[in-house]
């Protein structure tokens, strides 16, 4: 997701190839609005934006989000349906997000800098796509190359 959608993505789409996978740090996205409560709408908006741009979102969250989300019944339905993947209780979802991103060579939508995991995942910063949700619209950061410290 480092660049805007271009000819390569259009070619893959026309050939029926699966869209590129992007991991969504669902807990981070849900809590990107004001207040302590997570908002399921933020997750939906980010996923819709990614699909609109030709990507397939995979939402990963920590188990605590189920106690912090505003639309609990709908959230549980999405977890049960596999739309949202929840890390096991008592584990660190960040580890799973970073591990999957490395294994799948995927980008991560998150405003978390994962500084506490920098030693184990030195490539994490180059995988990040920062975002903002403003008045129901999602803006994704566009980068043309890796970040430099």
Task: Give a label for each model feature.
Residues 13, 19-22, 29-35, 40-149:
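Nuclease catalytic cores that cleave nucleic-acid phosphodiester bonds
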Residues 1-18:
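Acidic, polar low-complexity linker/tail segments
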């Amino acid at each position: 997701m480092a660049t805007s959608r271009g000819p390569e993505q259009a070619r893959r789409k026309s050939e029926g190839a699966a869209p590129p996978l992007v991991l969504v740090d669902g807990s981070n996205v849900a809590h990107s609005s004001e207040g302590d409560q997570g908002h399921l709408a933020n997750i939906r908006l980010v996923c819709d934006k990614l699909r609109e741009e030709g990507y397939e979102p995979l939402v990963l969250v920590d188990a605590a989000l189920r106690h912090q989300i505003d639309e609990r019944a709908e959230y549980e339905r999405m977890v049960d349906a596999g739309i949202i993947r929840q890390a096991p209780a008592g584990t660190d979802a960040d580890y799973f997000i970073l591990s999957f991103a490395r294994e799948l060579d995927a980008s991560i939508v998150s405003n978390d800098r994962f500084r506490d995991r920098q030693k184990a995942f030195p490539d994490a910063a180059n995988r990040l796509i920062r975002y903002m949700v403003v008045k129901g619209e999602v803006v994704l950061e566009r980068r043309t190359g890796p970040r430099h410290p």
